Swiss-Prot record:
It is an enzyme of class 2 (transferase). This is tRNA (cytidine/uridine-2'-O-)-methyltransferase TrmJ. Keywords: Cytoplasm, Methyltransferase, S-adenosyl-L-methionine, Transferase, tRNA processing. Coiled coil: none annotated. It is found in: Cytoplasm. Pfam families: SpoU_methylase (PF00588). One of its GO terms (cellular component) is cytosol. Homodimer. It comes from Yersinia enterocolitica serotype O:8 / biotype 1B (strain NCTC 13174 / 8081). Belongs to the class IV-like SAM-binding methyltransferase superfamily. RNA methyltransferase TrmH family. The keyword Cytoplasm applies. GO terms for molecular function: RNA binding; tRNA (cytidine(32)/uridine(32)-2'-O)-methyltransferase activity. S-adenosyl-L-methionine binds at T79, S80, A81, G114, I134, S141, S142, L143.
Length: 257
């Protein structure tokens, strides 16, 4: 299960933080590190501060975009303070660990950490199913990157051990599979295109409407089959003659022959 947990660092600017993160991960049994557009590449300082976790650094996956790091994941949790202009479903660290451990038994899970100074952007946070806030001392809440990783990695490990060491097998109601992040992004693109064509939103400025719709569907968290129904509804609207239809490659063409 732990191999399905991805620790994703976005635009890290200090190699020492990469090394300290690798150390924090390995102590909790996590090895899957993703670096999104790092401002510097891992170097000797990263290896030194990894303190024996150089294999985590050496095997890190370096990608250009957050979308690449999230590809194939069924659950994405982003670290954030609570004060955001657009509220989002929040988790406490313990609940984050429990949910991550449960879903990682079936599909990859990403825990996303932002830049050292400014964290994650609103656009990046909207790609997450949940946000997690670490309840630090409000008078001094300064956690460095590796500390934050250590806290969430610990919660994942505790939840993992609880599931492994339960006296009796954990019996849970069988859940239908959730769509992967890639499928959700295709749905949001499809939804925005259809709503633009119907005039419900302005194509040049989808802005707040799409943000609120993302929040709605994130909160509802539709299953894969339910998402297929929604896609089918959008396709049905597109089939009306006055709306362009999309080809397999996403290009648009008029529905009239």
């Amino acid at each position: 299960m732990l191999h399905n947990i991805r620790i994703v660092l976005v635009e890290t600017s200090h190699t020492g933080n990469m090394g300290s993160t690798a150390r924090a991960m390995k102590t909790m049994g996590l090895t899957n590190l993703y670096l999104v557009n790092p401002l510097v590449k891992p170097d000797s300082q990263a290896i030194a501060l990894s303190a024996g976790a150089s294999d985590v650094i050496g095997n890190a996956t370096i990608v250009d975009t957050l979308d690449e790091a999230l590809a194939g994941c069924s659950l994405v949790v982003g670290t954030s303070a609570r004060s955001r202009t657009l509220p989002w479903p929040m988790l406490e660290p313990r609940e984050c660990g429990v949910r991550s451990a449960r879903e990682a038994e079936h599909a990859p899970v990403a825990l996303v950490f932002g830049r050292e100074r400014v964290g994650l952007t609103n656009d990046e946070l909207q790609k997450c199913h949940y946000h997690v806030a670490i309840p630090a001392n409000p008078e001094y809440s300064s956690l460095n990157l590796a500390m934050a990783v250590q806290i969430l990695a610990y919660e994942v490990r505790v939840a993992f051990l609880d599931r492994q060491q339960a006296a009796a097998p954990i019996v849970e109601e069988e859940e239908a599979p959730y769509p992967l992040v890639d499928d959700l992004e295709r749905f949001y693109l499809h939804l925005e295109q259809v709503l633009s064509h119907t005039g419900f939103i302005r194509q040049a400025h989808p802005g707040q409407i799409m943000s609120k719709l993302r929040r709605l569907f994130t909160r509802a968290r539709p299953e894969a089959q339910e998402l297929n129904i929604l896609r089918g509804m959008l396709t049905s609207i597109e089939k009306q003659d006055k709306y362009p239809q999309r080809g397999a490659d996403g290009s648009e063409h008029n529905g009239k022959n």
